[in-house]
Design a protein with these regions (language model features):
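Alpha-helical membrane-targeting segments
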Residues: 47-74, 126-166
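Residue-level signal for the nucleotide or nucleotide-sugar donor/cofactor binding architecture
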Residues: 8, 12, 73-79, 109, ...
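Two-component system phosphotransfer/interaction surface
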Residues: 79-82, 86-90, 187-195
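Mid/C-terminal beta-alpha module of Rossmann-like enzyme folds, strongest
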Residues: 87-155, 171, 191-192, 204-208, ...
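Active-site Tyr-X1-5-Lys
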Residues: 5-32
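NAD(P)-dependent short-chain dehydrogenase/reductase
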Residues: 24-73, 78-80, 86-87, 118
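Amphipathic terminal alpha-helices
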Residues: 169-177, 181-220
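Generic structural signal for alpha-helix termini and adjacent loop/cap motifs
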Residues: 58, 91-94, 196-200
């Protein structure tokens, strides 16, 4: 068991919920699924949608990153998540009383590979990324957030401290207990996401709650 050390409120709430379940479950068995970032064929992932938006619109910030570009985070296709939940229900009588499992793609795309793949899919070119100091990134995010007439940025100053995080998941428990492993991969699904964007950019932006750039406003 890797020690749990949540560093901001969202994961802290998950750890507190797990502890509450263990304390209050009584004689009822529990299955705790620690799920990676979920996406589908259209995207429907907040961080991925914003990353695609930045590269699609060629924002200068799309070329900058305040962390190790060789690091990455695990994701999980929605269909693989549904499959895992169904397997939990089907095998509930054979699982341990407290079954804790990680669900996600074991080998994450690095930030650098993700950038290059999106650059090639969107513009037919590699998308080189420059690592910038965290303080510079925090200052830029803060200025964008307080400057009148500028849109409130997705990336907030407090997020910068987590840019170096790397999540490669051990899904061996799910394999053993559920006979489950992901059938999809973010690497193979990215072309589908970009195809969905190209088919109807306005609808894609609206579905992901993104502000339309001027060129798309004209197509409304």
């Amino acid at each position: 068991e890797w020690p749990l050390d949540p560093r901001w409120p969202y994961p802290q709430s998950k750890v507190e919920t797990e502890r509450m379940l263990e304390k209050e479950r009584g004689n009822y068995p529990t299955a705790v699924l620690r799920i990676a970032g979920v996406y589908d064929d259209d995207c429907q992932s907040i961080p991925l949608a914003h990353q695609i938006e930045r590269i699609y619109e060629r924002h200068i910030t799309s070329k900058m990153f305040p962390g190790h570009i060789s690091h990455g985070q695990s994701f999980l296709h929605l269909e693989d998540l549904v499959d895992a939940i169904v397997r939990v229900l089907e095998r509930r009588r054979t699982l341990p009383e407290t079954a804790v499992m990680l669900l996600g793609e074991p080998e994450p795309l690095t930030y650098d590979e993700l950038q290059h793949r999106l650059g090639r899919l969107l513009h037919g070119e590699d998308w080189d990324t420059v690592r910038i100091p965290k303080m510079m990134a925090k200052t830029g995010a803060w200025l964008q957030g307080v400057t009148p007439l500028l849109e409130d940025p997705f990336i907030k100053p407090w997020m910068i401290d987590f840019a170096d995080d790397h999540y490669a998941l051990d899904v061996s428990r799910a394999k053993e207990w559920l006979h489950w492993e992901p059938r999809h991969s973010l690497r193979d699904t990215l072309p589908k996401m970009i195809d969905a964007l190209r088919r109807d950019p306005v609808a894609w932006y609206r579905a992901h709650h993104l502000s339309l750039p001027a060129e798309l406003e004209e197509k409304r």
